[in-house]
């Protein structure tokens, strides 16, 4: 996964003019007030991780990556830092931080976030990637309490926001196909701007992008997984949970009573584990993306909270008016040989219990998208196909529709939150039971992580297979789907096994990268930092 880079990368073409040209931007300013422009640089000896290491010690930064179809890198990776606006919300209060000032709003988080994003009108340009700037962050599972009558959790020890987003108008886009980097900036067009004002704003963006190119030219010390021995196995040590085994098993039994009485068909119960660690979250992310490459991989650093994860499952995506969701249910390990791999896939597709659960989630997805899609456009593009990843295979379907003209990506998001795979069916009653039995707020777990673009595109995943770092403690939450014939001991063990895969990445990073290694910001040349 990590190629040895023994010499500094060769950067070329950073002196090229911006695209679109300033005269084109002036024309677009008649309709839009935030116009993306970009500068290309050759990056055939770079990697997204290598680039991101230059920014990982900033207070606020993000890296979004992806593997498609389980085994092929998606075309684009996105890197950003130094947001011009920070938005966080909890318990009906939204805090906006900009230019060192704080503003407090008393409003529902999504309504306030929608109002902020609606201030920006940005074009979708064919030659540019789907994300050219916007809000990057997370929605917590408990966000639905603002929109549905749900009981509040009695405990919130993790104490994280219901939403937290970085607004970034400058993005580094790594194009894996063309082996080049797009340095993307956005020209802000103020009300009443003259052509000369727009030219000045354009020139300022050009200056910032050139400063970024100069900063990226700085040599980065080579560092790859090959530089350290990868342990075959690691001891996890002491692991703490927010519930005892007896409590979890009791919760499963109670959930089965609700199922037998006809309240629900399924409910997903979870527990949160934590361990103390001195591992670098970035090194943990490097291990994770190697052990478990996934469609959604992310590193979000927001002050004293860092979230890293490799989620296999989309929540909802909106791109150019098309809305889609990808239910995943049904899992088997990968086979040692190709013959065994094929046999395991056939066994999975013939498993009636796995098929029934998957069909239920596909129906949920069709219903969710039906609420925001044009009549007759919701369809199942792919149904019950096997998607292979490094260690496991899943049954995956793809449901899509055409977004109604009176709806936007916020409507699509709310129609799908939370996913049935982390709540149950029917959703609302399952969530009530989760609040009753789990008692402790889930925080980011089972919510969503992704981007909300200024241009109207959105891509979010379900927050699973994710680690939250707060100070020197790492938190991992995992759940199991409870149905009428669930075996409580087995469901408990399923949550433990899921969590162990993430905790193993932490212990592996500790073994491979000792805490005595100096952080990379010790070699940052401040001359190359820019101020957005």
Language-model segments: residues:
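Intrinsic, low-complexity polybasic segments
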Residues: 4-5, 10, 224
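Extended alpha-helical targeting/anchoring segments
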Residues: 13-532
């Amino acid at each position: 996964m990590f190629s040895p880079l023994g010499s500094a990368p060769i950067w070329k073409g950073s002196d090229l003019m911006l695209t679109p040209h300033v005269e084109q931007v002036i024309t677009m300013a008649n309709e839009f007030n935030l116009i993306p422009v970009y500068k290309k640089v050759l990056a055939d000896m770079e990697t997204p991780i290598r680039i991101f290491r230059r920014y990982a010690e900033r207070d606020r930064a993000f890296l979004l990556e992806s593997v498609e179809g389980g085994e092929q890198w998606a075309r684009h990776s996105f890197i950003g830092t130094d947001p011009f606006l920070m938005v966080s919300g909890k318990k009906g209060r939204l805090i906006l931080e900009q230019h060192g000032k704080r503003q407090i709003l008393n409003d529902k988080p999504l309504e306030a976030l929608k109002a902020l994003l609606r201030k920006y009108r940005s074009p979708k340009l064919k030659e540019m990637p789907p994300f050219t700037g916007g809000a990057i962050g997370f929605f917590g599972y408990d966000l639905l309490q603002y929109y549905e009558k749900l009981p509040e959790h009695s405990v919130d020890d993790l104490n994280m926001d219901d939403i937290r987003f970085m607004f970034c108008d400058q993005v580094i886009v790594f194009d894996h196909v063309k082996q080049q980097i797009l340095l993307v900036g956005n020209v802000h067009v103020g009300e009443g701007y003259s052509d000369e004002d727009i030219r000045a704003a354009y020139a300022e963006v050009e200056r910032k992008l050139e400063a970024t190119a100069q900063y990226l030219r700085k040599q980065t010390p080579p560092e790859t997984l090959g530089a350290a021995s990868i342990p075959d196995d690691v001891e996890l040590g002491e692991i703490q949970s927010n519930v005892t085994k007896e409590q979890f098993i009791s919760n499963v039994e109670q959930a089965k009573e609700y199922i037998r009485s006809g309240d629900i068909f399924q409910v997903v119960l979870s527990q949160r584990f934590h361990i103390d660690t001195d591992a670098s979250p970035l090194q943990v992310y490097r291990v994770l993306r190697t052990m478990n490459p996934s469609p959604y991989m992310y590193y979000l650093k927001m002050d004293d909270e860092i979230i890293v994860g490799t989620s296999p499952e989309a929540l909802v995506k909106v791109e150019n008016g098309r809305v889609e969701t990808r239910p995943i249910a049904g899992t088997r390990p990968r086979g040692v040989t190709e013959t065994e791999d094929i046999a395991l896939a056939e066994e999975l597709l013939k498993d009636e219990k796995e098929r029934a659960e998957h069909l239920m989630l596909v129906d949920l997805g069709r219903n969710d998208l039906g609420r925001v899609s044009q009549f007759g456009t919701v369809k199942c593009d792919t149904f019950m196909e096997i998607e292979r990843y490094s260690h496991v295979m899943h049954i995956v379907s793809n449901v899509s529709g055409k977004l109604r003209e009176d709806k936007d990506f916020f409507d699509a998001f709310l129609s799908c939150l939370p996913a049935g795979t982390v709540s149950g069916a029917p959703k609302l009653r399952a969530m009530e039971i989760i609040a009753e039995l789990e008692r402790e707020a889930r925080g980011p777990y089972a919510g969503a992580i992704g981007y909300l673009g200024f241009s109207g595109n959105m891509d979010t995943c379900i927050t699973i297979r994710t680690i939250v770092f707060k100070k020197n403690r790492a938190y991992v939450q995992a759940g199991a789907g409870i149905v009428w014939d669930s075996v409580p001991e087995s469901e408990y063990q399923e949550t433990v096994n899921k969590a162990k895969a993430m905790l193993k990445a932490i212990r592996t990073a500790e073994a491979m990268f000792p805490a005595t290694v100096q952080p990379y910001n010790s070699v940052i040349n401040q001359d190359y930092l820019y101020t957005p």
